[in-house]
């Protein structure tokens, strides 16, 4: 009886930990989306830098996750490698926009951030 109870607890903890992991990916996606809106509406470099910095952290964290569509794939599968590569592209684009924001070029940073939407849309089609 005790072994059965321990087995049930072990399995349920794995189920709940994977569910919370998926929520983390969802939270990171929400952070990316919310802060992209901030970048688009910002009127000063400080707002843009703050939003882009939050986006960068969320993208790096999300890159470690596995989307529900790829849960049956191994971490080194071509699909998972492509999923992570999408975040490499996204982080590079965020860094480009952040560089412009650090130079006080708000409009240019906002224009550079528009590329994020193209990347988002492309990878959402594949993995969402």
From Swiss-Prot:
GO molecular function terms attached to this record: electron transfer activity; heme binding; iron ion binding
One cellular component (GO) term of this entry: periplasmic space
Which InterPro entries does this one have?
Cyt_b562, Cyt_c/b562
Q: Which Gene3D superfamilies does this chain map to? A: Cytochrome c/b562
Q: Which residues form the signal peptide?
A: 1-22
Q: What is its main location?
A: periplasm
Q: Any idea which positions bind heme b?
A: 29, 124
- Cofactor: binding comment: Binds 1 heme b (iron(II)-protoporphyrin IX) group per molecule.
GO biological processes: electron transport chain
Necessary cofactors: heme b
Subcellular location(s) of the protein: Periplasm
Q: Which UniProt keywords are present, listed alphabetically?
A: Electron transport, Heme, Iron, Metal-binding, Periplasm, Signal, Transport
- What does the record give as the function of this protein? Electron-transport protein of unknown function.
Subunit info here reads:
Monomer.
Concerning its family, UniProt says: Belongs to the cytochrome b562 family.
Supply the name of the protein: Soluble cytochrome b562
From what organism does this protein derive?
Escherichia coli O157:H7
Q: Which gene encodes it?
A: cybC
